Amino acid sequence: MKFLGIIPARYSSTRLEGKPLKMIEGHTMIEWVYKRAKKSNLDSLIVATDDERIYNEVINFGGQAIMTSKNHTNGTSRIAEVCEKMTEYDTIINIQGDEPLIEYEMINSLIETFKENKDLKMATLKHKLLNKEEIKNPNNVKVVCDKNDYAIYFSRSVIPYPRKNGNISYFKHIGIYGYKRDFVIEYSKMLATPLEEIESLEQLRVLENGYKIKVLETTHSLIGVDTQENLEQVINYIKENNIKI
């Protein structure tokens, strides 16, 4: 079983233009993501981009990159294009290009799960939420799972809704995915689904088509960079905790 990590990265962004090239303590964000992910047990790692500036930056810091179409609607679709070309890998790890604090253990946990579950098509991560404001925040996607740790639903709403008082844990979805290569290609050919579109969550397409997603719990939480404010949060966190690339 061979594992390929793919970091989809596009230049255009409605909230933070050119964010993969934003500087964080002397390095671009895409370099932070790449070099921290490179510490994992992946067999290979590549950035999939539609922009020559990002491509050149990755090559310049010693990474691998590939140019892809500008017509993709989400990261998984971009990854599927790479999967069509790189057929020697049977399992893919989708690493978000806007999460510079990624820990290699998160990637390794997905790798181990696929090694242990040969029939698994897709897996992802979750992190326990303790703060009520974080639970209510629609930018924190929540996930609920069955007793075997397969996703029942993902939502920007508070799920489960606390109609009665009870001892229940809330989990934030961490958007790092693992999939079998063939399933990524199959996913890319599925039509967008109603729940996916109303929640703006691409993983719901998988559930609506009747497939399962294994969800592993991680103790690591991430700060995704969608805005300038997020970027400043990451920079401050790195400084305060003396984190190195």
Curated annotation (Swiss-Prot):
Enzyme class: transferase
GO CC term, one of those recorded: cytosol
Compartments it resides in: Cytoplasm
Keywords: Cytoplasm, Lipopolysaccharide biosynthesis, Nucleotidyltransferase, Transferase
GO terms for MF: 3-deoxy-manno-octulosonate cytidylyltransferase activity
Known pathway: Nucleotide-sugar biosynthesis; CMP-3-deoxy-D-manno-octulosonate biosynthesis; CMP-3-deoxy-D-manno-octulosonate from 3-deoxy-D-manno-octulosonate and CTP: step 1/1; Bacterial outer membrane biogenesis; lipopolysaccharide biosynthesis
Organism superkingdom: Bacteria
CDD domains in the record: CMP-KDO-Synthetase
Catalytic activity: 3-deoxy-alpha-D-manno-oct-2-ulosonate + CTP = CMP-3-deoxy-beta-D-manno-octulosonate + diphosphate
Gene Ontology terms describing biological process: CMP-keto-3-deoxy-D-manno-octulosonic acid biosynthetic process; lipopolysaccharide biosynthetic process
EC number(s) stated in the UniProt entry for this protein: 2.7.7.38
Keyword Membrane annotated: no
Disulfide linkage: none
SUPFAM superfamilies: Nucleotide-diphospho-sugar transferases
Function: Activates KDO (a required 8-carbon sugar) for incorporation into bacterial lipopolysaccharide in Gram-negative bacteria.
Family: Belongs to the KdsB family.
NCBIfam families documented for this protein: kdsB (TIGR00466), PRK05450.1-3 (NF003950), PRK05450.1-5 (NF003952), PRK13368.1 (NF009905)
Full protein name: 3-deoxy-manno-octulosonate cytidylyltransferase
Biological source species: Fusobacterium nucleatum subsp. nucleatum (strain ATCC 25586 / DSM 15643 / BCRC 10681 / CIP 101130 / JCM 8532 / KCTC 2640 / LMG 13131 / VPI 4355)
Organism phylogeny: Bacteria, Fusobacteriati, Fusobacteriota, Fusobacteriia, Fusobacteriales
